[in-house]
């Protein structure tokens, strides 16, 4: 990085690296980071302000480092959302699911250890591996982005990872992960070896469910498997469907053993009193916070159908199956950066991510999606002719 003086003792493996992050630009239509586009209702804002005001006189003291009340709120929410009641000591909170994932890598990764994923996958995972000196290996998905379970099982046997990390629905493709696939991989992890570990040590399976509330109704969550599988950890967030990205609250559901491992590496008092108060206030309004999820699902399906009717260089656009609030589309964009740039000129920010030839767009308000559609039709013709 040119801005870093050469005389600073930056780690050798970080020299030349750039900070991770999607473009953060002030444009009218932001459809690039998979947020819920609808702001919290005024009643939710009032409750957040009330909760924070109540704890303000205590800010000279450290917060509850075990955040017991918030963990109970996670339990109540999962019982409602996924039909599974977990104990408080089977839950853990952090500053976004990014911190949850980093804590998992800190606890179960490290020098001599390897984590296994399936590409294309979330681009932060190799960053967590790098930051914790953990090896990072990949098993390749099928051409339609569904998980190739046989390849994952082969990689588990060959790599002997300490963690297997899968996203459901997948990011950046949106692909759902069937429960039977999760159960097959869990079974393999329960007997697999971990390189460099002692006899009887087996890998954990981490399922990242950041977007799970957008799944098709009736689809179970991996949380329902935790009671029977102590080697399973499920990461969740309040940033997506719950419309709470600015508060930075993620949480982990897992056996008490896994939670206790994560507690070893957590920073003291890592969740501020303000964060805890705001999250508790949001959970008081779960119905309101999730009220737009069904509409966003409908928007996803309508947008997918519309995209399939569009063409680029006389070929219809491909759209990956999605159980999330975003769509990966294109498939044969030979100038995807040019399409991105032309959309940006028109005030629409999407994401260049995933395999070559594809772009990703998340679901915005009805007005934002209309702007996106109108801009894309114009842009595809311009880029074709260039």
Model-based region annotation:
Residues 26, 88, 320-326, 354-358:
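Short Gly/Ser/Thr- and Asp/Glu-enriched loop/turn motifs at secondary-structure junctions
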Residues 180, 341-346, 351-386:
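PLP-dependent enzyme catalytic core of the Aspartate aminotransferase-like
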Residues 2-96, 103:
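N-terminal small-domain helix-loop-helix segment of the aminotransferase-like
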Residues 136-140, 163-169, 204-209, 320-322, ...:
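Short beta-strands and strand-loop turn motifs
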Residues 41, 231-312, 318-319:
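PLP-dependent aminotransferase class I/II
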Residues 107-128:
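Conserved PLP-anchoring active-site segment centered on the Schiff-base-forming lysine
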Residues 147-159, 172-241:
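Active-site pre-lysine segment of PLP-dependent enzymes
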Residues 297, 301, 310-346, 363:
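Conserved PLP-binding catalytic core of the aspartate aminotransferase-like
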């Amino acid at each position: 990085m040119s801005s870093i003086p050469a005389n600073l003792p930056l780690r050798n493996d970080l020299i030349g690296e750039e900070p991770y992050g999607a473009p953060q630009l002030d444009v009218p239509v932001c459809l690039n980071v998979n947020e819920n586009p609808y702001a919290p209702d005024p009643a939710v804002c009032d409750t957040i302000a009330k909760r924070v005001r109540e704890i303000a006189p205590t800010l000279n003291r450290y917060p509850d480092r075990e955040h017991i009340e918030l963990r109970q709120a996670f339990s109540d929410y999962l019982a409602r959302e996924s039909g599974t009641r977990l104990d408080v000591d089977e839950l853990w909170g952090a500053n976004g699911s990014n911190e949850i994932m980093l804590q998992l890598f800190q606890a179960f990764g490290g020098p001599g250890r390897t984590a296994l994923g399936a590409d294309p996958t979330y681009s932060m995972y190799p960053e967590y591996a790098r930051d914790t000196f953990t090896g990072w290996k990949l098993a390749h998905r099928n051409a339609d982005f569904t998980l190739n379970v046989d390849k994952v099982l082969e990689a588990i046997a060959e790599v002997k990872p300490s963690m297997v990390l899968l996203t459901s629905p997948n990011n950046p493709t949106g692909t759902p992960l069937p429960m039977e696939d999760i159960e097959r991989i869990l079974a393999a992890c329960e007997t697999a070896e971990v390189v460099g570990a002692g006899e009887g040590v087996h890998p954990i399976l981490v399922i990242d469910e950041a977007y799970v509330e957008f799944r098709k109704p009736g689809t179970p969550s991996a949380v329902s498997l935790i009671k029977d599988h102590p080697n399973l950890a499920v990461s969740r967030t309040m940033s997506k469907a719950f419309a709470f990205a600015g508060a930075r609250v993620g949480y982990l559901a897992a056996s008490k053993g896994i939670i206790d491992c994560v507690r070893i590496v957590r920073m003291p008092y890592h969740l501020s009193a303000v964060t805890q108060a705001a999250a508790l206030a949001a959970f008081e309004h779960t119905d309101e916070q999730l009220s737009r999820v069904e509409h966003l699902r409908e928007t996803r399906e309508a947008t997918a159908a519309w995209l399939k009717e569009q063409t680029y260089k006389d070929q219809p656009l491909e759209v990956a199956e999605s159980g999330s609030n975003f769509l990966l589309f294109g498939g044969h964009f030979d100038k995807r950066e040019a399409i991105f740039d032309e959309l940006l000129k028109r005030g629409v920010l999407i994401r260049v991510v995933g395999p070559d030839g594809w772009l990703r767009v998340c679901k915005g308000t009805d007005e934002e999606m209309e702007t996106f559609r109108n801009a894309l039709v114009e842009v595809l013709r311009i880029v074709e002719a260039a």
